[in-house]
Design a protein with these regions (language model features):
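N-terminal alpha/beta PP-like core and its mobile active-site loop of ThDP/TPP-dependent enzymes
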Residues: 2-131
């Protein structure tokens, strides 16, 4: 990660965006939510990756999967926590069954900094395990 050599301090979201850029990601399909606003703020500064705003996470997932199918490059989709992440499950199964490369990004703040406490907190990794 040569881009880190001259960096004094970098956030996790900014580092993630730079890694996606290095991997050649051109588009991210998804929608904003409280849990991914920092990521989206840094994404808006990227001149290499364009956000394709969707109306629903499931649509974002299918767009990313189909992008992967048509280009052979990983399609990337973005959701917020809880129900937003569970809305990606059907498109994850579609991508897996069709051999389509896809990366799904979701966010979750530490519970102590969330206004809602544990509301909508799900173990997304366990939910995706069968797929």
């Amino acid at each position: 990660m040569s881009f880190l050599k001259n960096q004094k301090k970098i956030s996790g979201a900014e580092l993630f965006i730079k890694c996606l850029e290095q991997e050649g990601v051109e588009y991210i399909f998804g929608l904003p939510g409280e849990e991914n606003l920092d990521f989206l703020e840094h994404l808006s500064k990227s001149n290499k990756i364009k956000l394709i705003l969707t109306r629903h996470e499931q649509g974002a997932g299918f767009m990313a999967a189909t992008y992967g199918r048509l280009t052979g490059k990983a399609g990337v989709c973005l959701s917020t926590l809880g129900p937003g992440a569970t809305n990606l499950i059907t498109s994850a199964a579609y991508a897996q069954l069709g051999g389509m490369p896809m990366v799904m990004i979701t966010g979750q703040k530490p519970i102590k900094s969330s206004k809602q406490g544990k509301f909508q907190i799900l173990d997304v990794v366990d939910l995706m395990q069968p797929i």
